[in-house]
Amino acid sequence: MISVWIRVLGALLLASVAQAQFQFFEQMFGGGHQEHHQQGSQNSASDSSRYQQLWEATNCNKYLCPGTLACVDFPHHCPCEHPNVEDKVELGEGSAVCISKGGYKPGEAARKIELARKGLL
């Protein structure tokens, strides 16, 4: 009798976990009933024509950063595209990368890159 109850409880537990997962994915991916509140507006075109127009209209006699269209003296002086969530790390060879800010301390992302370059990470 106890083994029957254990099987029933196990089946109920599995069913509830499966239902919770399906609800998560349904909510995560829209579940087929997405609401659109865009009154008459459309998404931007998926080609690069708008970017090309901005590129061609930008005046710069130095280096034009491809991601931000900032005019700078050297490529490694280009600002990050999303400075609120990215840290810029200069690699020392005249190049730089923008990486997601990580952790809780300022400069932690740069520290991790330096450790990786030294083979310690």
Swiss-Prot record:
Keywords: Signal. The keyword Acetylation does not apply. GO terms for biological process: ERAD pathway. InterPro entries: LCL2 (IPR034543). The keyword Nucleotidyltransferase does not apply. It comes from the Eukaryota. Residues 1-20 form the signal peptide. Probable component of the endoplasmic reticulum-associated degradation (ERAD) pathway. Belongs to the LCL2 family. This is Long chronological lifespan protein 2. It comes from Aspergillus clavatus (strain ATCC 1007 / CBS 513.65 / DSM 816 / NCTC 3887 / NRRL 1 / QM 1276 / 107).
